[in-house]
Amino acid sequence: MDVNKSFAYAIDNDDGKTFDNISSADVIILGPSRSGKTPLCYYLASLGLNAINIPLVPEVDQFDVIKDLDKSKMIGLIQDEEYLSKIRKERDKDLGITGVSNYSSLERVFYENEYAREIYSKLGIFVISMYGKSIEEVSSTIVRYLQN
């Protein structure tokens, strides 16, 4: 187990930047924007796992890219819509966006979560709700899942 290499892997493959190294992944995290993919991958890297994350955005159809990947390594994330909208509003503020943007609107978050659920259902993968759970708790669930 080389934690430094796992961190480098997580950073290099964050947010679906590239799929060149996906065959080296121990775990593939899917989810809407701001659902906790990146911090989860970094924590999994601290455990020595090569973790890649792929954002699910309805306007960017990733299904053809991910449908043939190893489903036993895939984890789908869902986050409570109101909580996710709140997090996105904070992100908007950090970016200097005032008012309600489409990105942070509750309607958009519901739409993205529904899209993610459809993808997870088509793939038949393990899904975890992030709501009210720590990164450590979710990581522990993932590690147990991967070991079975």
Predicted ranges, named:
Residues 4, 10-14, 97-138:
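Small-molecule kinase domains that catalyze NTP-dependent phosphoryl transfer to phosphate-bearing small molecules
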Residues 51-62:
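Short beta-strand-centered segment that lines the nucleotide-binding/catalytic pocket of NTP-utilizing
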